[in-house]
Amino acid sequence: MHVLLSKKIARFLLISFVFVLALMVTINHPKTKQMSEQYVTPYLPKSLQPIAKISAEEQRRIQSEQEEAELKQSLEGEAIRNATVNAIKEKIKSYGGNETTLGFMVPSYINHRGSPPKACFVSLITERDSMTQILQSIDEVQVKFNKNFAYPWVFISQGELDGMKQEMIRQAITDSMNGDPELINIKFAEIPADEWVYPEWIDENKAAESLISLANVPDGDSRAVRYQARYFAGFFWRHPVLDEFDWYWRVDPGIKLYCDIDHDLFRWMQDEGKVFGFTLSMSEAKEANEKIWDVTKKFAKDFPKFISENNFKSFITKKDSEDFNNCEFTSNFEIGNLNFYRSPAYRKFFNYIDEEGGIFYWKWSDSIIHTIGLSMLLPKDKIHFFENIGFHYDKYNNCPLNDDIWNQYNCNCDQGNDFTFRSGSCGGHYFDIMKKDKPEGWDRLP
């Protein structure tokens, strides 16, 4: 019995030895190692994977290449910065220095490695504006344009905007950007109280009389409209909340956009060297603009250095004379360079106009002040009419008459309601001065 058991144990040990020996041979076979590295290693955590051995010489080579690449990048960055600074200096010099209007604006037209323009939407909210109108205008701009570009919004309000209204605005913009927080940039600010009152040199009794005498002019009896006109003409661009921006797009409560805008308008303005873009123009009531042209001519005589040689005075004067024609770029849609208003020339012009008191003694609007300033202080080719943007405000419409444009941008407006070439508009006058071809059918509108 014991002998039989010993034989079984010996046989078991022999078989086990042979199995272990075969297993060791298999594990150490080259093909087995290759399969192990191919199928097992990739699934190991990085901390457990074998670290490739690099020779000291190879390590020095890699480090040297990294240092060389970093140095090259640093030198390229410095070269680009130096080239940019030199380009700015040369451009400013070519315009006659940074005291000139164009010279002052040069830095805002320089692209830094393809970075987008420093631009934003500006919406002024007064006590007269409803949240329905405000949210409508936000939705129009976000859906038709900004969902593709994510430019910031700046809301400047008359008094503090309460938390509920701010949240409604945030939610409207957030929803249009699919809730992506990285694409949402909203700023709220207040109009300084001293910029929404009569300035100290205004005779308030005389100003009150104009509210009565101009009651037959749209908003002619409104003091608030005059405060707003003065603020937009001379102060909104000074607000610290806009200091970081070069470009603005004014968005008034209640506006509508009729066409899709698939290209970056800010980038286009910057790349084309434009300063101001508009969609609607019209002739303002003569009674509202009493004496403003006389003051403008006096300014031009006192400060001839600010008047552009190739200016756009022909847009604001009659074809057969130097008389003022009351044409204005309607301010409910503006895309412009903030640095134009910040320039020494426009500051001087606005102060000159403001001290005359015509904003309150008559009804000089921000539209007419902007228009005269732009037309006198800039070359005419810096001002652009956006004929491919369908726009609506109040009872006025800009609807592209060019069928190709109308179809390309999915416009949903009635071309028969376009105001550009109608009586009371200055659109036809603009086309004539700029020698632009008018779209087919422009003369068949009532």
Curated annotation (Swiss-Prot):
Gene3D superfamilies: Spore Coat Polysaccharide Biosynthesis Protein SpsA, Chain A. Residues 115-446 are annotated as: Catalytic. Keywords: Glycoprotein, Glycosyltransferase, Membrane, Signal-anchor, Transferase, Transmembrane, Transmembrane helix. It holds the Pfam family Glyco_transf_15. GO terms for molecular function: alpha-1,2-mannosyltransferase activity; mannosylphosphate transferase activity. Glycans are attached at N82, N98. Pathway: Protein modification; protein glycosylation. The chain crosses the membrane at residues 9-29. Coiled coil: none annotated. The active site is at E334. Its EC number is 2.4.1.-. It is a single-pass type II membrane protein. GO terms for biological process: cell wall mannoprotein biosynthetic process; endoplasmic reticulum to Golgi vesicle-mediated transport; fungal-type cell wall organization; protein N-linked glycosylation; protein O-linked glycosylation. Present with 4380 molecules/cell in log phase SD medium. Glycosyltransferase that transfers an alpha-D-mannosyl residue from GDP-mannose into lipid-linked oligosaccharide, forming an alpha-(1->2)-D-mannosyl-D-mannose linkage. Required for addition of mannosylphosphate in yeast mannan. Recognizes any oligosaccharides with at least one alpha-1,2-linked mannobiose unit. Belongs to the glycosyltransferase 15 family. This is Mannosyltransferase KTR6. The gene is KTR6.
